[in-house]
Amino acid sequence: ISTSKLCVSYTIWKVGDYDASLGTMLLETGGTIGQADSSWFKIVQSSQFGYNLLYCPVTSTMSCPFSLDDQFCLKVGVVHQNGKRRLALVNGNPLECLFKQVQ
């Protein structure tokens, strides 16, 4: 399925099923707002100018995706699949993002 076609209709990210060939889970479009098990992400500052994207699934009724405690969150990074770069959950080397204020 072409990602460009999915982005036209679906704009909510989610974590897909485990991909054994990559050893991780890829990010996909087609999520649902408020879907606690696969669509809760947050942005955290990683350096003076950079930010990381974290996937923070709710594991119990006591957990909250907006909490300051990131111990239950997983990092989002880049993996290579069939010559293409894909966003995925990673153990190390998270993708560092920079944001520029639009004027």
Curated annotation (Swiss-Prot):
It comes from the Eukaryota. Disulfide bonds join 56-73. GO terms for molecular function: serine-type endopeptidase inhibitor activity. Keywords: Disulfide bond, Protease inhibitor, Serine protease inhibitor, Vacuole. SUPFAM superfamilies: STI-like. Pfam families: Kunitz_legume. GO terms for cellular component: vacuole. The keyword S-adenosyl-L-methionine does not apply. The keyword Signal does not apply. Its main location: other. The record marks 25-26 as: Reactive bond for chymotrypsin. It is found in: Vacuole. PANTHER family: KUNITZ TRYPSIN INHIBITOR 2 (PTHR33107), SERINE PROTEASE INHIBITOR 5 (PTHR33107:SF38). Belongs to the protease inhibitor I3 (leguminous Kunitz-type inhibitor) family. Inhibitor of serine protease. May protect the plant by inhibiting proteases of invading organisms. This is Serine protease inhibitor 4. It comes from Solanum tuberosum. The lineage of its organism: Eukaryota, Viridiplantae, Streptophyta, Embryophyta, Tracheophyta.
